[in-house]
Amino acid sequence: MKLVIVESPAKAKTINKYLGDEFKVIASFGHIRDLPSKKGSVIPDENFSMKYDISEKAGKYVDAIIKDAKKAESVYLATDPDREGESISWHIAEVIKEKNKVKSDDFFKRVAFNEITKKAITHAIENPRKLDNNLVNAQQARRALDYLVGFTLSPLLWRKLPGCKSAGRVQSVALRLICEREDEIERFKSEEYWDISLKMLNSNNELFTAKLTHINDQKLEKFSITNDKEAKDLTEKLKSQNFHVDKIEKKQQKRQPQPPFITSSLQQEAARKLGFSAKKTMQIAQKLYEGVDIGKETIGLITYMRTDGVTLSNDAVDEIRKLINKDYGDKYLPSSPRIYKSKVKNAQEAHEAIRPTNINYIPNDLKEKLEKDYYKLYELIWKRTIACQMENVIMDLVNATLASENKEYLARANGSTIAFDGFYKVYRESIDDEAEEENKMLPPLKEQEHLKTKEIIPNQHFTEPPPRYSEASLVKKLEELGIGRPSTYATILSVLQDRKYVTLEKKRFIPEELGRLVTVFLVGFFKKYVEYDFTAGLENELDEIAAGKLEWKSALGNFWNGFNHNIESVNKQNITEIISYVQQALDYHIFGENKDSKVCPSCKTGELSLKLGKFGAFLACSNYPECNFRKSIVSGNDNNEADGEAKDIVNENKVLGKDKEGIEIYLKKGPYGPYIQYGEQVDSKIKPKRSPLPAGLNQNDITLDMALKLLSLPLKIGNHKESGEEVLVGYGKFGPYIKYMGKFISIPKKYDFLNLSLDDAMKLIEEKLNAIAAKQPNPLNMDEVTNLVDKKIKVKKTKK
């Protein structure tokens, strides 16, 4: 028995019908091994050794693979024809070697095919090769890079920016693009401008529209007319002018078809034309590739969908040209096949473009046999494939220049018509941001023909900010920058949404506050690693590894040395400095240009500033604790410390010193913020004495003496000079206080409560008691105001 292993049951089912009884086709159900999500899965100090585990989910499938492999005379590894597929095959081979004690590599045969057809499968089985270690190493390097970034940068994020979930090597760069576009939009200042339209009638009374372009030989620029008065004055002048056709220019323009689909262009066009997300597009394309039931049989309808190559096989081109000639006629067929070259930065072009496996499977014939969305995507791929080998579209363009009698004013009218529809017969590509109006036909015009002015219309416009990224335009931008690969685009977009860093509204990406915090932090403290050129450079290095031009562990070492140094440096960075930088970077976004927006809306005297709490970032009033206003800046955050204290976050356990008995005093971070701790906790049932860090107190300013005083609270500072009762100073939920005869009296911010004198305390007590007495009603009109606290305190009698 010869064992064939593929990734999915659907693929196995389709392939099985093309092979004889001597073959058994089984599925691995995707990856069988991966780096576990824990520390130590990649060990840089051990030459980047990688510790793979068989996932719990894959366990039963691995058992079946091992069992069948024991009976097999050879194993055909028929996973997808890219780096990831090569990696899956390598992992399967490694597990079989380990479990079945297979020593010879000849036992394994790697077969790769770009489409699941009988011809392609048979050819692959008859022409096996060995596993390509270069491709495997490139995929291992990518996985190691992603792991090292994720498992070193993410924990640092948790410590420095509570509430932020993770950072990834490529996702962070995509997030930066979205955030920077939002910054552009926020800072954009709209400007007013005007243009003038002329509604004209030719000698046959046929209406057309022209636009004013010149005044006294001066070309009108975008901002030549900037207000209503200028526009109206000019409109009045034009009403008295007589115009004629000064010049007519005619020319033809050829429009060439777009290349066949690659992964990114398929995702972009499916988003524009069908409204599919990148993830949905790839899920459907995967099914169309692996095989779908079309009634009489299960077949793979399209070629492999993860590709950046734009070439088509000679056989495919021949079949496409035959169909064009048969169904559309020879005038739609170019004299020779069209050949395309990729414009994608760092394109691998190892595979064909995405095309139907059999161009004679006409979409309309399959409409009733395919699920609705499957049909839509297949039709899109089929039409694009046909169109890419069809004749050009030919456009007739007409430009008419209109002039006033003395040529003081010139206007222009443009028109276009399709002289030959060419590939438009089958397919027309969409664009992201289409103009409001396309060129229209002009009526017949002759030079020197006199025209009638029907209407002069001043049009007001305002400049608009750049549009937010759609899925299509973001994928296009990533592709242009050379960031990511065909297999990663959909995942990048999904991860950003899953982690609540961005939302997709009206098919446009909007960054959440959490995403902006992460981006500001990374740009400020890891700028090199979120630079577009650097990330594209890493992709290029992975390509060089795949081509055997670069040793993969050497590439990992070059990256890790600098990145790890950066991590260590930021780890030592003071949280106050980080908060200060983040606030400065987000200042315009949070407060805008109006300085009054920083004024606390509650107390009207304090100033709002950024704080970080256990649930993330929030704004707090500088008058805390007198003013307890705070507001989360993270949308959807219900736990925004609205009833807690505004705190900075301390990230390290720090020893401040020892007391007289030699016990160490610690500054630590807890779930509710920084605190002081007396000694180590040696018994899990007995907690050492602790004291929260007062709000507004910078943890870097805490001294041993201050810490000891905090731990001694509540502290007796003396006895009241009149009543003889003890006076205590403490610190609680609402800040520092004086405790006197069962009453709690807040200590204003202007006092240093840790060094409060008895005289100051007595003054605050008296003010408080007088305030209480003043608020008491006196319905009996008594001569003496009753002392509500204690009769031992003497009070003056009021006059009747």
From Swiss-Prot:
Gene Ontology CC annotation, any one: chromosome
Cofactor (UniProt): Mg(2+)
Gene3D superfamilies the UniProt entry points to: 3.40.50.140, Bacterial Topoisomerase I, domain 1 (3.30.65.10), Topoisomerase I, domain 2 (1.10.460.10), Topoisomerase I, domain 3 (2.70.20.10), Topoisomerase I, domain 4 (1.10.290.10)
Ranges annotated as C4-type zinc finger: 600-627
All residue ranges annotated as the Toprim domain in the record: 1-111
Any one Gene Ontology molecular-function term assigned to this protein's record: DNA topoisomerase type I (single strand cut, ATP-independent) activity
Gene Ontology BP terms: DNA topological change
Binding-site residues for Mg(2+), renumbered to this chain: 7, 80
Domain (Topo IA-type catalytic) ranges: 132-568
EC number: 5.6.2.1
Coiled-coil portions: none
Record-linked SUPFAM superfamilies: Prokaryotic type I DNA topoisomerase, Zinc beta-ribbon
Region span, Interaction with DNA: 166-171
One Pfam assignment: Topoisom_bac
InterPro entries: Topo_IA (IPR000380), Topo_IA_2 (IPR003601), Topo_IA_AS (IPR023406), Topo_IA_cen (IPR013497), Topo_IA_cen_sub1 (IPR013824), Topo_IA_cen_sub2 (IPR013825), Topo_IA_cen_sub3 (IPR013826), Topo_IA_core_domain (IPR023405)
Keywords recorded for this protein, A-Z: DNA-binding, Isomerase, Magnesium, Metal-binding, Topoisomerase, Zinc, Zinc-finger
Catalytic site positions: 304
Residues carrying the site annotation Interaction with DNA: 31, 142-143, 146, 158, 306, 499
The reaction(s) this protein catalyses: ATP-independent breakage of single-stranded DNA, followed by passage and rejoining
Assembly information from the UniProt record: Monomer.
NCBIfam families for this protein: topA_bact
Family: Belongs to the type IA topoisomerase family.
Annotated function: Releases the supercoiling and torsional tension of DNA, which is introduced during the DNA replication and transcription, by transiently cleaving and rejoining one strand of the DNA duplex. Introduces a single-strand break via transesterification at a target site in duplex DNA. The scissile phosphodiester is attacked by the catalytic tyrosine of the enzyme, resulting in the formation of a DNA-(5'-phosphotyrosyl)-enzyme intermediate and the expulsion of a 3'-OH DNA strand. The free DNA strand then undergoes passage around the unbroken strand, thus removing DNA supercoils.
UniProt-recorded name of the protein: DNA topoisomerase 1
Lineage of producing organism: Bacteria, Pseudomonadati, Pseudomonadota, Alphaproteobacteria, Rickettsiales
Gene transcribed to yield this protein: topA
